[in-house]
Amino acid sequence: MTDYHIRIRELPATDKPRERLRASGAAALADAELLAILLRVGVEGVNAIQLAQQLLVEFGGWSGLQRAGFEELAQRRGMGEAKTAQLKAALEIGRRLLLASGEERFQIRSPTDAAQLMQIEMSHLDQEQLRAICLDTKNRVQKIQTVYVGSLNASMVRIGEVFKEAIRLNSASIIVVHNHPSGDPTPSPEDIVVTRQMIEAGRLLDIDVLDHLVIGNGRFVSMRERGLAFIKP
């Protein structure tokens, strides 16, 4: 059986991603359409939108494409080095834009706000990292500091390092965030032990530990919301 593959240029103008973006704005486009604009062209038998859909499914969405190595993407049929470079550059722009909101004194009002600030960058890391978000009295971000790299372990984490920048900045509070490279954000017993130690140290330093978030693949857990290590109000 012969399959007839429609090229993007043969689609009606209302179905072409660039024309739809011009008419309706980028927010109106599906993920595959946005990615197709970056890719520009597909490969024999597959147009750019179809290639974009395949990539998003194959790699598990934007976070999977972020995690994928350059060579892994470049060797994929229909990609190559030029398309891979364009895609990686666009993903990095998105990451930096999100982090820039912290530099503009982004205000954190909920665990979701904190997770959105950190998730794009931290969900693709191969190693566990512990970071502290330093906040002022209005919960505005002062600085995000990486304080530890490696499996969270009560005997290895230096609690003083968690608060070092917060003390220097005279922060009112911190939110602690770490990732699980496995993708499962369920806090471990060790996570709970370390969190209790940080909460106690924060009390002594008069710096409130507002929450400890565990980041997974597209998901997160707020230990305060779960009542883990934190006393429920």
UniProtKB/Swiss-Prot annotation:
Alphabetical list of SUPFAM superfamilies matching this protein: RuvA domain 2-like
A molecular-function term among this protein's GO annotations: metallopeptidase activity
Start and end residues of each MPN domain: 107-229
Motif segment (JAMM motif): 178-191
Organism of provenance: Roseiflexus castenholzii (strain DSM 13941 / HLO8)
UniProt name for this protein: UPF0758 protein Rcas_0037
Binding site for Zn(2+): 178, 180, 191
GO BP annotations listed: proteolysis
Pfam name, any one: RadC
Protein family per UniProt: Belongs to the UPF0758 family.
Annotated keywords: Hydrolase, Metal-binding, Metalloprotease, Protease, Zinc
Residue ranges that the Swiss-Prot or TrEMBL entry lists as coiled coil: none
